[in-house]
Amino acid sequence: MGEVQREKVAVIIGPTAVGKTKLSIDLAKALNGEIISGDSMQIYRTMDIGTAKVTKEEMDGIPHYMVDIKNPEESFSVAEFQERVRKHIREITERGKLPIIVGGTGLYIQSVLFDYQFTDDAGDAIYREQMEKLALERGVEYVHKKLQEVDPESAERIHANNVRRVIRALEIFHTTGEKMSDQLEKQENELLYDVSLIGLTMDREMLYDRINLRVDIMMDQGLLEEVEGLYNRGIRDCQSIQAIGYKEIYDYFEDRVSLEEAVSQLKTNSRRYAKRQLTWFRNKMDVTWFDVTDGEKTSEILRYIEGKLQRKSNNSK
């Protein structure tokens, strides 16, 4: 009975710059869908260029959710993402449309699809403040090494610059004696939705070339001015500016590096992030992959999703 009632959801994942945005809009048009961003940084207003946020023109009339919902000064948690996205899925389904989640933030997407439970029970404000102080005084790498010692799986998954999540993982271990990675693993067994989960991949060198080109285009589009606007507003030590594309340019404004060095580091970090994204998706999710090295596979992907949706409809009768 539970199988019959599960809502249908299409999910498009893949590394940065692989072509998810265009595909998602093409599929939404063909499948009567509406799009939910699965990117943890596109939620922030005024951070458009550096997050490669979909433009109004690109949307082409397709409704998009989880974009521009927070100010850069505000924090945002996986738990809040989960709650909001599940609400959007219900509402889109009730309108007779297909929810299509698109993005590259693995943990966020996973938290929606699986029965992840987020509670405030495992919290210790004093310990958290101690870790935050350590991160400020001794650097984020020091705190990340502490996480490596107690929960290497989470340390592998969470980048050192994502200080909030590093400290949260340490806090969970400190208060419960249980690794965050173990808690998540327990909850990874059952999908809450009828999911068509597809991934885009391509030849690594081609992907890296696309990433480098994308950074050059971002600079031409005004990324420097976009980050300068945030910097001049006094935004410091916020979750938003830990994003790739912002922290590197911040280093330039704080006279740590030249602009050329900042752009070079941005390209390097973007390539590394793409590699981590692919590793995460391949290790954590049962994905049907489509290689788009030789061009887009929209028709093939559409046939796959339509076939899967049709089989599910027949099975529910």
Swiss-Prot record:
Substrate binds at residues 16-21. This is tRNA dimethylallyltransferase. SUPFAM superfamilies: P-loop containing nucleoside triphosphate hydrolases (SSF52540). ATP binds at residues 14-21. Gene3D superfamilies: 1.10.20.140, P-loop containing nucleotide triphosphate hydrolases. Residues 39-42 are annotated as: Interaction with substrate tRNA. It comes from the Bacteria. Coiled coil: none annotated. One of its GO terms (biological process) is tRNA modification. Belongs to the IPP transferase family. Catalyzes the transfer of a dimethylallyl group onto the adenine at position 37 in tRNAs that read codons beginning with uridine, leading to the formation of N6-(dimethylallyl)adenosine (i(6)A). The record marks 105, 128 as: Interaction with substrate tRNA. Its EC number is 2.5.1.75. Transmembrane segments: none annotated. The gene is miaA. PANTHER family: TRNA DIMETHYLALLYLTRANSFERASE. Keywords: ATP-binding, Magnesium, Nucleotide-binding, Transferase, tRNA processing. It holds the Pfam family IPPT. Monomer. InterPro entries: Dimethylallyltransferase, IPT, P-loop_NTPase. It catalyses: adenosine(37) in tRNA + dimethylallyl diphosphate = N(6)-dimethylallyladenosine(37) in tRNA + diphosphate. GO terms for molecular function: ATP binding; tRNA dimethylallyltransferase activity. It comes from Bacillus cereus (strain AH187). Its cofactor is Mg(2+).
